[in-house]
Amino acid sequence: MKLFELQPAPGSKKLPNRKGRGIGSGNGKTGGRGHKGQNARAGGGVRPGFEGGQMPLYMRLPKRGFNNYEFSKKYTEVNVSDLNIFDEGTVVTEELLKSSGLAKKIIDGVAILGNGELTKKLTVQATKFTKTATEKIEAAGGKVEVV
């Protein structure tokens, strides 16, 4: 057997369905779109949920419950491992995190998360700390200050 004689296993490759190639193909003339109407046109069709002008089902059913998401506080998250860029003994404030690029946009404050390891003794000031973040900062000899 030579390289040019290699062929895929029979039945493993399916030919694309070619529309509009004669009536005998089964997909000729209208190409599976039926006769006339919005769906037969190029770019035709209606959006999902549209019922031809009839009040759609999702609007006929009552609303239920509420969502409190927009009232929740949005904290900028910074991991403990990211704080290793600062020098030993630095007081890490939210302004310092922003100027260093670790916290790009501070809305309701900064939350320090406990992912990774901290190797330097730092005093960290932030709005929120996770339990593991507090443990890791204090284990490195640093201090945690909730602002």
From Swiss-Prot:
- GO function terms (MF aspect): rRNA binding; structural constituent of ribosome
Q: Does the keyword RNA-binding apply?
A: yes
Q: Which InterPro entries does its entry note?
A: Ribosomal_uL15 (IPR030878), Ribosomal_uL15/eL18 (IPR021131), Ribosomal_uL15/eL18_sf (IPR036227), Ribosomal_uL15_bac-type (IPR005749)
What keywords does the record list, in alphabetical order?
Answer: Ribonucleoprotein, Ribosomal protein, RNA-binding, rRNA-binding
Cellular component GO terms, alphabetical: cytosolic large ribosomal subunit
Q: Where is this region: Disordered?
A: 1-54
Compositionally skewed regions (Gly residues) per UniProt: 22-31, 42-52
GO biological process terms on file: translation
Q: Does the keyword rRNA-binding apply?
A: yes
Q: Which NCBIfam families match?
A: rplO_bact
Subunit record text: Part of the 50S ribosomal subunit.
- List, alphabetically, the HAMAP family matched: Ribosomal_uL15 (MF_01341)
What is the documented function of this protein?
Binds to the 23S rRNA.
Q: Which family does this protein fall into?
A: Belongs to the universal ribosomal protein uL15 family.
Record protein name field: Large ribosomal subunit protein uL15
User: Which organism is the protein's source?
Assistant: Ruminiclostridium cellulolyticum (strain ATCC 35319 / DSM 5812 / JCM 6584 / H10) (Clostridium cellulolyticum)
The gene that this protein is the product of is: rplO
